[in-house]
Swiss-Prot record:
It comes from Bos taurus. Non-catalytic component of the METTL1-WDR4 complex, composed of METTL1 and WDR4. Interacts with FEN1; the interaction is direct. The gene is WDR4. PANTHER family: TRNA (GUANINE-N(7)-)-METHYLTRANSFERASE NON-CATALYTIC SUBUNIT WDR4, WD40 REPEAT PROTEIN 4. It is found in: Nucleus; Chromosome. Belongs to the WD repeat TRM82 family. PROSITE patterns: WD_REPEATS_2, WD_REPEATS_REGION. This is tRNA (guanine-N(7)-)-methyltransferase non-catalytic subunit WDR4. SMART domains: WD40. Residues 377-414 are annotated as: Disordered.
Length: 414
């Protein structure tokens, strides 16, 4: 899957990634003008043992970052790239701790709540765990699906591992015994693009899909609590209103029980309120932008940061004012962070025409009745054409009339 630009926030730490590079800085003025840049193309690579007929290594990656995330406390940051590497960082101060190899290209990753392990989901449907405490240790196979995994999450108490796949399923497995399945959350009609366990309501799960819905679940029982079609919230006059899309990011603000969604490069961000008591999602606002939105993330107590495809204003900060989310006035911190991104804009230039790779995951529609009627019409046309070729040519006075056998004999004797 291709990867567009990404944004991650934890505490005051902010990371922007694009191509093979990541840029880490701080949103706090007290941290000074801190800046950390890492390029995966400069990281160590495992020697390629498999070679093609020409003797050259095969299956070389482009070092593009495919997924990344912070640990719960923000002490660690991890990324994976399409050269099949898992790169772990310490964030205070920023330092690369290890570069490890994964079996297959990864689609999603997460830390356990204890921050002792990293769970990595890959394209073949497997989840591997890697130790944080032993940063150079190898991976361990934990569980597997029969189809591609698109996201992985853990419950806040580390008891359950939740996985989302291409075949519309969300599986809830026991972390201590992943072969033991607690439940399935079934209801989506397309691939499940993102899942998110609500941290301050740990029994609840949010999920999104290629079916353009956001759903709320009680995941241990597999019970769907609420379904919100995103297409019902957009204006039909928008140029992208008839486009099929999937949510590429679910981000959450615990302080206000607020959910924000960015959608596969569309110039919008959906805002919802989670009503945990009523077990429902309440649509609050649809933020629209002049440029495509790459990613969005909440900074607790500060607001919603939005990364967009605009070199002049790559980052926009929104805050709630009178019940509505509005663009915050430009501050010294915002100017400083945007300046860092502008200087390093080259890492984002290749992301301009790249989506999150969901377009190839939709089910192929098969209209059997249309195919049947088309083939039937072709068959009738062929039969008519065959009869036309077999019919005798018309005489000078029109088509020749067929004669009965008796008439033919009488005509011959006269």
């Amino acid at each position: 899957m291709a990867s567009s630009a990404g944004l991650a926030l934890c505490g005051h730490a902010l990371v922007v990634r694009g191509g093979s590079r990541l840029l880490a800085t701080s949103t706090s003025s007290s941290d000074g003008d801190s800046l950390f840049i890492y390029d995966c193309s400069a990281a160590e690579k495992k020697s390629q043992e498999n070679k093609g007929e020409d003797g050259q290594p095969v299956d070389q990656g482009s070092d593009t970052v495919l997924a990344s995330t912070f640990s719960k406390s923000g002490s660690y940051f991890v990324l994976t790239d399409d050269s099949k590497r898992l790169i772990l960082f310490r964030t205070n101060p920023w330092q690369c701790l290890s570069v490890r190899t994964v079996v297959r290209r990864c689609t999603a990753l997460t830390f356990t709540a204890s921050e002792e392990k990293i769970l990595v989901a890959d394209k073949s449907g497997d989840v591997y765990s890697f130790s944080v405490l032993e940063p150079h240790g190898g991976g361990r196979l934990e569980l597997g699906h029969l189809s591609m995994l698109l996201d992985v999450a853990v419950s806040p108490d580390d008891r359950f591992v939740l996985t989302a796949d291409r075949d519309e399923k969300i599986r809830v497995s026991w972390a201590a015994a992943p072969h033991s399945i607690e439940s399935f959350c079934l209801g989506h009609t397309e691939f499940v693009s993102r899942i998110f366990v609500v941290p301050n309501h740990p029994e609840l799960l949010l999920s999104s899909s290629g079916d353009c819905t956001l759903r709320l679940w009680e995941y241990r029982s597999g019970r769907e609590l609420h379904c919100c079609p995103l297409t019902s919230l957009q204006e039909p006059t928008e140029p992208w209103s008839d486009k099929r899309f999937a949510v590429s990011r679910i981000t959450y603000w615990s302080q206000e029980d607020c959910v924000a969604l960015s959608c596969d490069g569309l110039p919008v961000v959906y805002i919802f309120q989670l009503d945990a008591a009523q077990r429902q999602l309440v649509p609050r606002q649809l933020l629209t932008f002049q440029h495509r939105v790459w990613d969005a993330a909440f900074e607790e107590g500060h607001g919603l940061w939005v990364l967009q495809d605009c070199r002049e204003d790559p980052l926009v900060l929104y805050r709630p004012v009178g019940g509505q989310w509005q663009s915050a006035p430009e501050s010294a911190e915002l100017r400083r962070v945007c300046a860092h991104v502008r200087v390093n804009w080259a890492m984002l230039e290749g992301c301009a025409g790249v989506d999150s790779g969901f377009s190839s995951l939709y089910k192929a529609t098969c209209d059997n009745m249309t195919t049947y009627l088309k083939k039937k019409e072709e068959r009738l046309q062929q039969q008519l054409e065959k009869k036309r070729r077999q019919a005798p040519p018309p005489g000078p006075n029109g088509p020749t009339k067929k004669m009965r056998a008796g008439e033919l004999a009488q005509g011959c004797s006269s």
